[in-house]
Every structure is written in structure tokens, then in C-alpha cells.
Design a protein with these regions (language model features):
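Structural signature of hydrophobic alpha-helical transmembrane segments
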Residues: 3, 60-71
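Conserved small/polar residues in nucleotide/adenosyl-binding loops
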Residues: 191-193
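Short, non-helical or kinked segments that cap or interrupt transmembrane helices
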Residues: 8-15, 23, 84-96, 177-184
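Transmembrane alpha-helix boundary signature
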Residues: 42-54, 83-87, 106-112, 139
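Membrane-interface alpha-helices at helix entry/exit sites of multi-pass transporters
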Residues: 22-34
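Membrane interface segments of multi-pass transport proteins and intramembrane proteases
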Residues: 141-156
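C-terminal ends of transmembrane helices
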Residues: 75-86, 142-146
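Mid-bilayer segments of alpha-helical transmembrane spans in multi-pass integral membrane proteins
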Residues: 75, 79, 98-107, 123, ...
Length: 193
């Protein structure tokens, strides 16, 4: 349920621009996003490893019900926010849900603090890198194209939109696809599979 909610609310963002500007037909854009999400999910294990064994100590005595409660909490919270049209991060929600359920069952000893420091560093870095990257890219675009006619730029930026949409779909797979795999790995490790 968690990954279905996550895909329903987050995955369309990767193709929204190319579909709304009619650079790609919806069917082609959805197919591209599906393939690249899968490729992204299978292209690494860093996120899955962090979620699966880097933030919650499976030897602390947490149960499979703990993982289920953490995931269910995200589904309820995410569905509630979607219903009210509020922005929500299922990544933060999953981590918080798993942590909250583990702390409720075992206490703070269930948390792996080194793993949490990596998570918080990643969050802080992504905010900073996103701001700086967007600022630099926008500055370069304005500087290069400030005298260009908008009508002539549609085709060029259309190709760039396809590239950025493809990259967003792949990135969504590397992050959110692996996040779900990590939660499943955590659950499977609790039942010793």
C-alpha cells in the first residue's frame, strides 16, 4: 500500500511538464517514466541499505508489527494529506513512522544514530544543493537566452524537458523505489529471510 500511495502521488511529477506542455503524449511519457523508475530502483542499493539496516537496529528486538505500523502510519498520513491537498514527503514519513514505532516498542535504543546522522546530512545537503543548482542553472539560462525569441525556443526547451523528465523518473526510482525495497528488506530480515 505504501509504495502504491507513493507512486500515485510522487511519480507523476516526473512527467507533468512534458505532458502539460505537449512535448510528449501522455502514454509515451508514462511508459518512459515506468521504465526509468524501474531502472532507477535497480541501479543501486544505498537508499535501500540505509532504510533496511542503517536507521533501525533489527537486533534491538523490534517486531514485524513495528515495521507494519510504521508503514501504515505513512499510508494514513499520506492519504490524509493528499485528501486535503497538502504537500507531504513520504520519505520523511516512512523514516519517522518506522522510528516512532520502534521507539514506542523498544525505546531510543532501537535507533542507529550514525544512520540518522547520514539521513539528516542528506536532507540538509539536498536543500542546499537544490537551491544552489537551480540558481546557477537559471542564471546561465537567462544569460544565454536573454535575447532569444520565445517562439524559437520551444523546440529546444522541449528536448531539454524530455531529458529532465527522464532524469526525474530515474531519480525517483533510485530514491523512492529503493526506499520501499529497504522497508521490505527490514521486514524480511526480522523474519530471518
Amino acid at each position: 500500500m505504501f509504495e502504491a500511495l507513493n507512486g500515485w502521488t510522487d511519480a507523476p511529477n516526473a512527467i507533468a511538464t512534458v505532458v502539460s506542455t505537449r512535448v510528449m503524449p501522455p502514454f509515451v511519457a508514462v511508459c518512459m517514466a515506468a521504465v526509468l523508475n524501474l531502472v532507477g530502483a535497480l541501479s543501486g542499493t544505498a537508499v535501500a541499505a540505509t532504510i533496511g539496516k542503517g536507521v533501525i537496529d533489527i537486533d534491538s528486538g523490534i517486531s514485524l508489527q513495528t515495521v507494519a505500523c510504521g508503514a501504515l502510519g505513512v499510508v494514513v498520513w499520506g492519504g490524509f494529506c493528499v485528501y486535503l491537498k497538502l504537500p507531504v514527503s513520504k520519505s520523511h514519513g516512512l523514516l519517522s513512522g518506522l522510528a516512532g514505532a520502534a521507539v514506542q516498542e523498544i525505546g531510543f535504543d532501537a535507533l542507529i544514530w550514525d544512520g540518522w546522522s547520514k539521513v539528516f546530512e542528506g536532507m540538509a545537503f539536498s536543500l542546499f544543493a537544490g537551491f544552489v543548482g537551480a540558481f546557477v542553472v537559471m542564471t546561465v539560462i537567462i544569460w544565454i537566452f536573454h535575447k532569444a525569441q520565445p517562439s524559437g525556443m520551444r523546440r529546444n526547451f522541449g528536448h531539454l524537458q524530455i531529458f529532465s523528465s527522464a532524469f526525474m523518473a530515474w531519480s525517483h526510482g533510485t530514491s523512492d523505489g529503493q526506499k520501499a525495497m529497504g522497508a521490505m528488506a527490514l521486514a524480511l530480515s526480522l523474519i530471518h529471510i
